[in-house]
């Protein structure tokens, strides 16, 4: 918030100046201001000598006047004192008297306390995780042994969980045939490529080193082949206009929503950019309001923020958004005191408190934005498909301006539809769930998707990090379908702004996927979701495998350069084995592999020829694709080293910290780039020098790897620049339709961000009369407290008063924010006590300037 010094502070008596400064921070009329300050004990003339302690008495009297009632003689005073008694009046002066279902938002309780409910009325139910089933082999051995002993097999509790109506849907035979076809394509293509690889090697796979190279090549090539055929089938599906099993075609686009199809739009957040979070939430809410279906939805922000400043800002932002859109009773907020199990615990806490009130829930990320039409369509699809447990949208990446992010937005927008359509083609109703921008059927989710910790010790045990794949597998195990509505429009997200922020996110995902792989052979899961676990780990395990493949290839080169050839490799061999080098075969195999990587991108361009104008025109679209291919090749070795490090770290027991990703266009500094990429540069230079020393002609083969590593520092810095991103947009490169013609929801989100004022923090919650009233009203007031708790809180108030804001830890600040009596008492003391630390006094000397944008404060009383 913008602050300035008040002009009324010159030569005023201590108690009068304090009261004037206090009233100046309240949105009151001049008449009410005069009424509050009119008191014989607060003279207006200067130069009168008054005991400084009178300032505290004057503040107390001012609080009594604000509370609009003076306690009669012998009457029990307001709980928490006169300052707490003024909370309701201060709240009403600032925010008016909002109504929720005909009742005032600010409720006055019989015990004298006031409270603002920020969440829905609780309707508690249970959500209990089940123990993980045994390994397939373990279960088979155990039951086989029991049969040999004449005992019945142990009943499998998870076999009784198939209560979903879509255990074997009409789509299942088609899906089974398609997956076998995919497996055949991958195996055939990998076998052929591995055969040609044996012809490239000098001894054709006759020694251990070459056998190891062949094994790694087969694994890596099969991974590339699976991606290639997924994209190709996606191309065919999109070219012919869609799949006949497409779930988005199962409901009429204008079908009315049933009144009992109650849906909660939940947004779990943790230490996020508050302005961006509530701007996106507001844009989504307003878009839904334009559809006329707002009555079916509630919006709930679920905060796990551990920063007291952000907690204060979130409550203030919730209030302002509700006032701006009339969202009281529709938009809710909850701050979780016991922040356990990260996002899964936050969602589970929602399910236990309010899940039984809703049939569906839509999960959003902190950077998610969805259109009202998309939300309404998701509910229609759920209603039309009673066997669907999860329907995942394919969110479009928008909103970033760095060159790196714009390239990634272009890639996901142009190539992404091929891969998501291909995934849908193979998976159908046994698909992915990505944790956000998806709708979930609440009842089966609560019954089957509670996550038990993984047994054991170490970083790959305990609470599951990457919960989404596991929840999809559990939902499908129970007989409910999991679908991707890849052609559904109106779902948006944001990407990391630079390479280093992307790999920070990848480290969390890497460890989460490695943990999930422990469930790969657990009993009860469907084969498709076993494949999902496998592809999840291969997304990161392929990096160290590729690195090892390159190291072994370098070792083979060193052996042939430094060690005399061995012509007799087998006992009693009659004829020598001559090493053969066939550069033309190696080039052909390299070209074939590059084609598998490059052809899906060309196919994507072919699909967009008619829409090329939305991408800057066909020439710029093709140029953008070519530049993206080059940049991807340059970044691939750096990503390889990062992912290799993450895999090694996970298996070595190195812990990770789970921090929220940046929600703004953060640029990489040269210092950070040197720290993070310095070892990559040295490795690239040393590796290239070694190969040149061994055989100069082989440097060209390795140049794309070592050259990229040598350039990793400037590449990382330059790609993170916003100026380069904007220049590329002005040149018409990396354009996407959402930039050429931005959706209304994205435009409004940006407008709300730009119009927002500075958010309040913990110090404002203590000092500012309005923010203090808001935080006191939204906290839970407990009139009856143990004497020990009262003593601790009273001591904390004195410690905060004399020590100032810097003397308080985060946990102490949260204690004060959670106790409205202590918070209001500290508020009174920092205004009136001579013992107040200078940190409080400096803030107290400032007056909030009236905001000039959204109506953050109502008209004066």
UniProtKB/Swiss-Prot annotation:
Q: Does the keyword Chloroplast apply?
A: no
EC number(s): the record gives 2.4.1.-
Its Gene Ontology cellular component terms are: plasma membrane
Q: Which GO terms describe its molecular function?
A: hexosyltransferase activity
Its transmembrane ranges are 181-201, 208-228, 532-552, 589-609, 616-636, 698-718
Domain of life of the organism encoding this protein? Bacteria
Location of the region described as Disordered in the Swiss-Prot/TrEMBL record = 65-89, 101-129
Pfam families in the cross-refs: Glyco_trans_2_3 (PF13632)
Location(s), subcellular: Cell inner membrane
Query: Pathway it belongs to?
Result: Glycan metabolism; osmoregulated periplasmic glucan (OPG) biosynthesis
Q: Could you tell me the membrane topology recorded for this protein?
A: Multi-pass membrane protein
Q: Which CDD domains match?
A: Glucan_BSP_MdoH
Q: Where is the signal peptide?
A: none
GO BP terms: namely: glucan biosynthetic process
Principal location listed in the UniProt entry: membrane
Question: Which spans does this entry mark as compositional bias, Basic and acidic residues?
Answer: 67-76, 105-114
Supply the enzyme class, top level: transferase
Q: Mind telling me which Gene3D superfamilies this protein's record contains?
A: Spore Coat Polysaccharide Biosynthesis Protein SpsA, Chain A (3.90.550.10)
> Which keywords appear in this protein's UniProt record, sorted alphabetically?
Cell inner membrane, Cell membrane, Glycosyltransferase, Membrane, Transferase, Transmembrane, Transmembrane helix
Q: Which family does it belong to?
A: Belongs to the glycosyltransferase 2 family. OpgH subfamily.
Function according to Swiss-Prot or TrEMBL: Involved in the biosynthesis of osmoregulated periplasmic glucans (OPGs).
Q: What is this protein called?
A: Glucans biosynthesis glucosyltransferase H
The coding gene here is: opgH
């Amino acid at each position: 918030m913008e602050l300035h010094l008040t002009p009324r502070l010159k030569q005023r008596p201590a108690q009068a100046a304090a009261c004037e400064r206090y009233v100046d921070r309240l949105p009151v009329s001049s008449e009410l201001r005069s009424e509050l300050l009119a008191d014989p004990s607060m003279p207006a003339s200067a130069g009168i000598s008054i005991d400084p302690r009178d300032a505290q008495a004057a503040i107390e009297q001012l609080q009594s006047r604000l509370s609009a009632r003076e306690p009669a003689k012998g009457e029990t005073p307001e709980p928490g004192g006169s300052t707490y008694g003024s909370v309701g009046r201060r709240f009403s002066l600032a925010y008016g008297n909002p109504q929720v279902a005909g009742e005032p938002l600010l409720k006055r309780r019989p015990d004298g306390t006031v409270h603002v409910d920020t969440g829905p009325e609780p309707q508690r139910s249970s959500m209990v995780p089940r123990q993980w089933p045994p390994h397939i082999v373990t279960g088979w051995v155990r039951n086989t042994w029991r049969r040999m002993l004449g005992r019945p097999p142990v009943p499998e509790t998870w076999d009784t969980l198939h209560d979903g109506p879509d255990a074997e849907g009409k789509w299942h035979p088609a899906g089974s045939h398609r997956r076998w076809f995919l497996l055949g394509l991958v195996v055939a293509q990998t076998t052929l490529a591995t055969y040609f690889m044996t012809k490239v090697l000098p001894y054709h796979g006759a020694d251990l080193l070459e056998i190891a190279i062949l094994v790694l090549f087969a694994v890596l090539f099969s991974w590339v082949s699976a991606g290639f055929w997924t994209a190709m089938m996606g191309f065919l599906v999109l070219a012919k206009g869609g799949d006949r099993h497409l779930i988005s075609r199962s409901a009429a686009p204008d079908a009315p929503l049933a009144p009992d199809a109650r849906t909660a739009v939940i947004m779990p957040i943790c230490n996020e950019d508050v302005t961006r979070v509530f701007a996106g939430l507001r844009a989504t809410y307003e878009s839904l309001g334009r559809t006329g279906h707002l009555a079916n939805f509630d919006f709930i922000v679920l905060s796990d923020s551990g920063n007291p400043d952000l907690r204060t800002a979130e409550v203030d932002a919730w209030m302002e958004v509700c006032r701006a859109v009339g969202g009281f009773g529709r938009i809710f907020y909850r701050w979780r005191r016991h922040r356990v199990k990260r996002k899964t615990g936050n969602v589970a806490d929602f399910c236990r408190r309010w899940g039984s009130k809703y049939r569906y829930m839509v999960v959003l990320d902190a950077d998610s934005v969805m259109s009202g039409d998309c939300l309404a369509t998701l509910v229609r699809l759920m209603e039309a498909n009673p066997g669907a447990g999860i329907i995942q949208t394919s969110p479009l990446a928008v909103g970033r301006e760095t060159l790196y992010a714009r390239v990634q937005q272009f890639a996901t927008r142009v190539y992404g539809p091929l891969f998501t359509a291909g995934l849908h083609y193979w998976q159908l109703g046994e698909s992915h769930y990505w944790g956000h921008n998806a709708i979930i059927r609440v009842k089966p989710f609560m019954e089957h998707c509670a996550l038990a910790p993984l047994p054991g010790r170490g970083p790959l045990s305990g609470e599951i990090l990457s919960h989404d794949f596991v929840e999809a597998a559990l939902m499908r195990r129970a007989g409910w379908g999991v679908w991707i509505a890849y052609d559904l429009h109106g779902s948006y997200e944001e990407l990391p702004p630079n390479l280093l922020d992307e790999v920070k996110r990848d480290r969390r995902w890497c460890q989460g996927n490695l943990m999930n792989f422990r469930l790969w052979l657990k009993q009860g899961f469907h084969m498709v979701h076993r494949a999902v676990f496998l592809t999840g780990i291969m997304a990161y395990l392929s990096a160290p495998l590729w690195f090892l493949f390159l190291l072994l290839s370098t070792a083979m080169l060193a052996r042939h350069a430094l060690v005399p050839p061995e012509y007799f490799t087998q006992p009693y061999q009659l004829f020598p084995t001559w090493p053969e080098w066939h550069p033309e075969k190696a080039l052909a195999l390299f070209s074939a592999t590059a084609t598998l990587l490059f052809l899906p991108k060309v196919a994507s361009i072919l699909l967009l020829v008619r829409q090329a104008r939305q991408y800057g025109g066909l020439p710029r679209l093709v140029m953008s694709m070519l530049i993206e291919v080059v940049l991807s090749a340059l970044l691939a070795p750096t990503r390889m080293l990062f992912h290799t490090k993450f895999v090694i770290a996970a298996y070595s027991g190195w812990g990770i910290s789970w921090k929220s990703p940046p929600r703004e266009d953060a640029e990489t500094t040269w210092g950070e780039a040197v720290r993070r990429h310095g070892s990559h540069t040295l490795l690239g230079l040393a590796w290239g020098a070694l190969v040149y020393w061994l055989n100069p002609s082989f440097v060209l083969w390795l140049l794309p790897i070592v050259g990229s590593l040598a350039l990793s520092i400037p590449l990382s810095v330059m790609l993170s620049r916003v100026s380069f991103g904007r220049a590329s947009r002005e040149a018409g490169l990396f354009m996407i339709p959402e930039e050429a013609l931005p959706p209304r929801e994205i435009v409004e989100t940006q407008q709300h961000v730009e119009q927002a004022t500075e958010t309040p923090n913990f110090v404002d919650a203590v000092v500012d009369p309005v923010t203090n009233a808001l935080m006191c009203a939204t906290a839970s007031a407990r009139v009856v407290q143990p004497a020990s708790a009262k003593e601790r809180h009273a001591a904390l108030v004195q410690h905060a008063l004399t020590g100032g804001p810097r003397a308080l830890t985060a946990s102490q600040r949260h204690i004060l924010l959670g106790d409205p009596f202590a918070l209001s008492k500290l508020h009174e003391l920092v205004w009136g006590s001579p013992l107040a630390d200078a940190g409080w006094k400096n803030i107290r000397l400032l007056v909030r300037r009236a905001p000039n944008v959204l109506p953050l404060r109502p008209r004066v009383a």
